[in-house]
Curated annotation (Swiss-Prot):
Protein name, entry field: Putative competence-damage inducible protein
Highest taxon of source: Bacteria
Organism classification: Bacteria, Bacillati, Bacillota, Bacilli, Lactobacillales
Species in which this protein is naturally found: Streptococcus pneumoniae (strain ATCC BAA-255 / R6)
PANTHER family given in the database record: NICOTINAMIDE-NUCLEOTIDE AMIDOHYDROLASE PNCC (PTHR13939), NMN AMIDOHYDROLASE-LIKE PROTEIN YFAY (PTHR13939:SF0)
Record-linked InterPro entries: CinA, CinA-like_C, CinA_C, CinA_KH, Competence-induced_CinA, MoaB/Mog-like_dom_sf, MoaB/Mog_dom
Signal peptide (UniProt feature, chain positions): none
UniProt similarity note: Belongs to the CinA family.
SUPFAM superfamilies given in the database record: CinA-like, Molybdenum cofactor biosynthesis proteins
NCBIfam families assigned to the protein according to its UniProt record, in alphabetical order: cinA_nterm, PncC_domain, PRK00549.1
Amino acid sequence: MKAEIIAVGTEILTGQIVNTNAQFLSEKLAEIGVDVYFQTAVGDNEVRLLSLLEIASQRSSLVILTGGLGATEDDLTKQTLAKFLGKALVFDPQAQEKLDIFFALRPDYARTPNNERQAQIVEGAIPLPNETGLAVGGKLEVDGVTYVVLPGPPSELKPMVLNQLLPKLMTGSKLYSRVLRFFGIGESQLVTILADLIDNQIDPTLAPYAKTGEVTLRLSTKASSQEEANQALDILENQILDCQTFEGISLRDFCYGYGEETSLASIVVEELKRQGKTIAAAESLTAGLFQATVANFSGVSSIFEGGFVTYSLEEKSRMLDIPAKNLEEHGVVSEFTAQKMAEQARSKTQSDFGISLTGVAGPDSLEGHPVGTVFIGLAQDQGTEVIKVNIGGRSRADVRHIAVMHAFNLVRKALLSD
């Protein structure tokens, strides 16, 4: 089924409101296996809406119109659809009764002829009751095309879609998705590696999405059950993870988790809890962002001992007991400083892990290092590891955010190697 969404309302075209209904509808339709091919917005104009309906009827088998069902003169969706289909508007008894009750309880409200429009549906349509408003929706099929009219306010549209429309549209199959999350590899490189899978996809499908510092892959398939979907998605997932970078590194090494809400931080916090280990941090350029991210999760007192924000050389020396002359000799942006910060954070808090971040957030270079240069140290029983990452071409906020992601990834790898 090819679906098309037409949002009716001049206020959308002028930018007065954001068309969140289209996003909601597309998401919910995808969940039941209905593909949305087109989204369009049109003003409150009969001629332009008629033209758009003509186009939609030729290319889509499901046409959903949102908005324009109210009581004002510019609410003309149902009237225009009826004209396009050569049908009359008729009153829905249930909607009429709701309108009667509404005004009976509000004797001071003036009931004008325009109010009656809200109880009308196109002749032959199945009414879609409005649980939170007065304007009734409708669904009808003409010449192989299903037309649906829905109210514009999201508070009215969402329950109508969830409780009225979707049960009437559901077929034997649904869309099932799985999200793979990758860190340490860019979208362009990932897409190049997976070019054959992407170019030849039919079902299941995969779609890459770039986010700040990471990439996700959404795997989707239509199936009649979760078990059937898992079989198809497992095959595609293994095909993806078995691929290698040009340097011969498996994509499995970059895939850190699943799901829309998962993050490197959540993975690390849960694994620290599972292993019963603790962590402390010493931060310079990130100014406590790593620690604040840890503290976003409940129950972290069992794994987070504390930490230090040592922005200046003097505070690195005073708070972490690193000799100032050594810091001056090596520089605050250096492998040495990252190593000592991590080791001292671990030692002073008696934690299993000590993590450190020092570098150049920008906008100016520091000690000859360009913006985006970051040293991250991780101290543990087995010794201290320091990595250098270059996060160039980013804003100050992005440099700090991505640096913290690298720190969490370093801890994640250490936890997995134990």
